[in-house]
Regions:
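Negatively charged, low-complexity tracts enriched in Asp/Glu with abundant Ser/Thr
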Residues: 1-39, 73-79, 95-104
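A structural detector for beta-sheet-dominated domains
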Residues: 7, 43, 54, 65-67, ...
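Long protein-protein interaction modules used by eukaryotic assembly/scaffold proteins
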Residues: 74, 86-87
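Short, intrinsically disordered low-complexity segments
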Residues: 38-63
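Short secondary-structure boundary motifs at beta->alpha junctions and helix caps
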Residues: 59-80
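C-terminal partner/receptor-binding element of secreted or periplasmic proteins
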Residues: 89-93
């Protein structure tokens, strides 16, 4: 499991701020080698939040529009990890209401 440090969280709504942190940690759980250290900052930019994810050698930024629904932060971070080749979790499929869905 990767190590995650939330260095700053500026989201003004306490419940949403806590959910953002949980979803980021959950998404990064399967990223890279088990000792990979990720540092994150969640910045409030008024109409959206910006999530900075830092790893030695690079920094990526995600924009999450407010209000962010449950799971939106997790999906955005997972998509970023997939794009960077850092997502080690195998995607599984299941049927939900007659259509294929993923665990993501």
């Amino acid at each position: 499991m990767a190590r995650v440090a939330i260095l700053r969280n500026e989201v003004p709504d306490a419940a949403m701020a806590s959910r953002f942190e949980r979803e980021i940690a959950d998404a990064l759980r399967h990223a890279g080698p088990s000792d990979t250290p990720f540092a994150c900052a969640i910045l409030d930019e008024g109409l959206h939040a910006e999530i900075e994810i830092e790893l030695p050698g690079w920094t990526e930024r995600l924009v999450i529009p407010y209000p962010a629904g449950a799971g939106e932060v997790r999906r955005a971070v997972r998509r970023l990890l997939q794009d960077l080749g850092l997502d080690d979790e195998v995607e599984t499929f299941h049927v939900v209401e007659g259509r294929a869905a993923t665990d993501r």
